């Protein structure tokens, strides 16, 4: 193994030298004290958790999970085709179809798998399909399109003019699909969804939208930005996750019966893996149902988002201005981004994970702040003042959100 160890060590050392080495934080989350956690025997406040609404610890969700555990056991027992098609997952798929006003849904083990295997399978099902993909689409989308080996065009981030130019270059009668996200997880920008829908109609293309960072958070029932804009019925495939606002695990797609059935019969990421256990699918169903009926969590969430952005404006903290709940603070240097994150955690008891390349482009390294309804005014002030002190110590310039927004957005779409 010594020869291969040398190769592995060289690879690791290169990543370390670039300030990109990732270390796991050993955390003990506290279900009864969200958003606190325990880290190295001290209590910390979590500001980067994707459990957007704290639904993982909601009493309805936890009780549903406990009941399912006692009724069905821990595991699912197999793949969906062989012993693992528990009634709980069928109920979940009905709930998801209703959420997005679609005929049916298909659940996967993760959002990554849902994107990857669905997109790759569409190329098997639809001969000569051409993909049109936003340049900042998630790695799971990129992986699915790449493994499809289909013809593809990548359009500039959020640039519908460039997208149309690319669509014009392909025969109108050739099958096409436009793949995009409703909200981009690293910059928080929303896609021009209605403009993309109009282009899809004009150029005879299917639409595939990734709503993982918006389901549960936007829309009357939590159906995401497409529900908020009342255009769910104009999008062919809506993909989402159960692992963020809904507080569980898993991914899904929703569409019409024929498309979903074709994916069900084709996608290896669905066919050849054990299904979600009933304890998870039952919890997810109850989480979705609660957020369909309750708007309280969404309202409180938006209030905290607004308060945090206002605080950052007040302290001149350089966040990337957007309309969403995702609040990136651009550092622009991997070493400094790591230092800021470590100082927040070790000196102030605040956990914000730094985001470096390859997750974001080089030169746009950042912290990504994720507010929840449980974050208090004191927590907001503590985070803001800690950042000001750390920026001063590390000689990181404070600048207004408006100024930075122009500079960084040009960098992102160049």
UniProtKB/Swiss-Prot annotation:
Per UniProt, what is one GO molecular function of this protein? pyridoxal phosphate binding
Please name the InterPro entries in this protein's record. Answer: 4pyrrol_synth_NH2levulA_synth (IPR010961), Aminotrans_II_pyridoxalP_BS (IPR001917), Aminotransferase_I/II_large (IPR004839), AON_synthase_class-II (IPR050087), PyrdxlP-dep_Trfase (IPR015424), PyrdxlP-dep_Trfase_major (IPR015421), PyrdxlP-dep_Trfase_small (IPR015422)
Residues at the active site:
244
Q: Supply the SUPFAM superfamilies for this chain.
A: PLP-dependent transferases
GO terms in the biological process aspect are: protoporphyrinogen IX biosynthetic process
Keyword entries, A-Z: Acyltransferase, Heme biosynthesis, Pyridoxal phosphate, Transferase
Q: Which PROSITE patterns match?
A: AA_TRANSFER_CLASS_2
CDD domains this protein is in? KBL_like
What's the catalysed reaction? succinyl-CoA + glycine + H(+) = 5-aminolevulinate + CO2 + CoA
**Which branch of life, at top level?**
Bacteria
Name the coenzymes or cofactors required: pyridoxal 5'-phosphate
Q: Which Gene3D superfamilies match?
A: Aspartate Aminotransferase, domain 1, Type I PLP-dependent aspartate aminotransferase-like (Major domain)
Which residues are reported to carry the modification N6-(pyridoxal phosphate)lysine?
A: 244
Copy the pathway line from the protein's UniProt record: Porphyrin-containing compound metabolism; protoporphyrin-IX biosynthesis; 5-aminolevulinate from glycine: step 1/1
Broadest EC class assigned to this enzyme = transferase
For the ligand (pyridoxal 5'-phosphate), the binding residues are 185, 213, 241, 273-274
Q: Does the keyword Acyltransferase apply?
A: yes
- The EC number(s) this enzyme carries: 2.3.1.37
- PANTHER family under this entry? 2-AMINO-3-KETOBUTYRATE COENZYME A LIGASE, MITOCHONDRIAL, CLASS II AMINOTRANSFERASE/8-AMINO-7-OXONONANOATE SYNTHASE
Self-association or partners: how does it assemble? Homodimer.
The name this protein goes by in its record: 5-aminolevulinate synthase
Q: Which gene encodes it?
A: hemA
